[in-house]
Structure formats: structure tokens, C-alpha cells
Amino acid sequence: MKKAGLLFLVMIVIAVVAAGIGYWKLTGEESDTLRKIVLEECLPNQQQNQNPSPCAEVKPNAGYVVLKDLNGPLQYLLMPTYRINGTESPLLTDPSTPNFFWLAWQARDFMSKKYGQPVPDRAVSLAINSRTGRTQNHFHIHISCIRPDVREQLDNNLANISSRWLPLPGGLRGHEYLARRVTESELVQRSPFMMLAEEVPEAREHMGSYGLAMVRQSDNSFVLLATQRNLLTLNRASAEEIQDHQCEILR
């Protein structure tokens, strides 16, 4: 019993340290790097010179930019042209806010252009990390390849994913996930952030503790994946963990 108690105490200490490291990462100057790129470089250059550089695309009227990430050959980031920190922002559950996940899905074409040939939809994934699972304080959705093992697991669970948020059997990458099937028409009309906030009990009050991902299924539906921070299981809710920025799935 004493050993079990000691082990539990050690796990708590590790969890607290992990949380502290996550907080430390978000308090330095480097956590504002993406925001500075968007607001001080991409947006002004587009407005003054009709050149989105260093971004790949700038859409001021639509409220977003697309930037090639330095990590991985095909990874891109979709970000707002104004200040939104991350999943904790109440703006994401405001109906007037752009549907960033849908916009990010449209931006997957940048992967194909960079690759030099079409990247199959089944190889693409979108992900945004929780407040403690991210390293940047500017909202950004990762547009990148899906891990082959995650792709296989989702394919195998196609029949188990319904139009309600339910636990995904076995979770992903050692962490618990909720999964929800959505059609393209649903996705166009309603943001995944709103679906999560309105349909999962108490999620609205704790949106910053969630990481969210999206993948296309073989039946042309989409699956939304949500994981919530749980420091006792060392889950910082970094939904980006389902992605493979080296794109092994294309080899």
C-alpha cells in the first residue's frame, strides 16, 4: 500500500512539473513568434504590397492567413489575422467568428502544391493543441499528414464512430479521445469548436483544456477528435500527436 501511495505521489509531482514546463513555454518571448509573423509581416506586406510573404496566403477580409511551417516538408498553419490565443478563447464559440477548421480544410491544397502532386484526403489531418499542449500563444491549426497507425485505427473504427461525441475505443497514442462523425454540410454550417462546446457536458467552461483534430473518413464523412488535458495520465491534450510531419503515409 505504501508503494502504491508513493507511486501516486510521484505521478502527481511529475504532472505538476509538466504543467509548469508547459506554462513556462508560454510565457517567454518566443511564444509570440507566430503572432508577430502574422501581424507584423504577412498582413502588412499583403496590404501594402499585395504580397503575402512570408505567408503563403493572406485573406484579410476572410480573417486568416496560411503559413508554411518550418517543421516538416508539407506542414502548414492556418491562423487568424487578429488576436486569438487558442482554444480557450470565447471568440471560437461566437457564431460570427470564421469557421477556421473548414477554412483549414480548404487550405490543404497547399500541401499538394508543395508536394508536386495531389495529396489524398485520407492522408491529411488538422489539429489544434490545448492551452498546455501548445508552444505558441497565437491560434493556429496544423495542416499536415496523419500518422499511418492513427489512420489505420480510425479506419478500423469507422463503424464505431457516430454523430454523437463518444469515447473512441482504445483512444489514440495512449490518450483518451472523444470522436464524432460529421458530414461536410454540417462542417460548412457549424464550427467544430461550437459542436464541442454545445454537445459535450461542461466543455464550454473548459475549452482551453481541449485539443481538437479532424480527419476525413473513407465514406467521405469527417471525424472530429477531442482530447482533454489530464495531467495524471500525462496528457497535455496536444492533438498534434496524431500527425506525422514527415509524411510517412505518402511513401
Curated annotation (Swiss-Prot):
Keywords: Cell inner membrane, Cell membrane, Hydrolase, Lipid biosynthesis, Lipid metabolism, Membrane, Phospholipid biosynthesis, Phospholipid metabolism, Transmembrane, Transmembrane helix. Gene3D superfamilies: HIT family - CDH-like. The chain crosses the membrane at residues 4-24. Belongs to the Cdh family. It is an enzyme of class 3 (hydrolase). One of its GO terms (biological process) is CDP-diacylglycerol catabolic process. GO terms for molecular function: CDP-diacylglycerol diphosphatase activity. The lineage of its organism: Bacteria, Pseudomonadati, Pseudomonadota, Gammaproteobacteria, Enterobacterales. Pfam families: CDH (PF02611). This is CDP-diacylglycerol pyrophosphatase. The gene is cdh. It is a single-pass membrane protein. Pathway: Phospholipid metabolism; CDP-diacylglycerol degradation; phosphatidate from CDP-diacylglycerol: step 1/1. It catalyses: a CDP-1,2-diacyl-sn-glycerol + H2O = a 1,2-diacyl-sn-glycero-3-phosphate + CMP + 2 H(+).
